[in-house]
Amino acid sequence: MERVRDLASEKAAVIFTKSSCCMCHSIKTLFYELGASPAIHELDKDPQGPDMERALFRVFGSNPAVPAVFVGGRYVGSAKDVISFHVDGSLKQMLKASNAIWL
């Protein structure tokens, strides 16, 4: 979990994904459309990916474990959570507050 914590804090917005995950692609696209440039960690392309995926599942309980979204170093949630935050307008506010976007 330490590696996940370190990576989750490296930028204002961080998304743990898998390259074959359609919801991961959707969340990445949403962030790009909002003007954010998140750090993307493809767990299926990282040698430590399986360990990080297990840690994400164990700590946050999301199944599947990806996408796992962090804003300002804080776990925001999975795709369902992020979409809910986007719909109610709070995702953009989180991104602004963490300096992931400026407008």
Swiss-Prot record:
Disulphide bonds in the chain: 21-24
Keyword check for Cytoplasm: yes
Gene Ontology terms describing biological process: negative regulation of transcription by RNA polymerase II
CDD domains to which the protein is assigned, alphabetical: GRX_GRXh_1_2_like
Domain Glutaredoxin residues, every copy: 1-102
Protein keywords: Cytoplasm, Disulfide bond, Electron transport, Redox-active center, Transport
Gene Ontology CC annotation, any one: cytoplasm
Compartments (UniProt record): Cytoplasm
The keyword Disulfide bond is annotated on this UniProt entry: yes
PANTHER family named among the record's database cross-references: GLUTAREDOXIN
Primary role: Has a glutathione-disulfide oxidoreductase activity in the presence of NADPH and glutathione reductase. Reduces low molecular weight disulfides and proteins.
Family classification: Belongs to the glutaredoxin family. CC-type subfamily.
Cross-referenced NCBIfam families: GlrX-like_plant (TIGR02189)
Record-given protein name: Putative glutaredoxin-C12
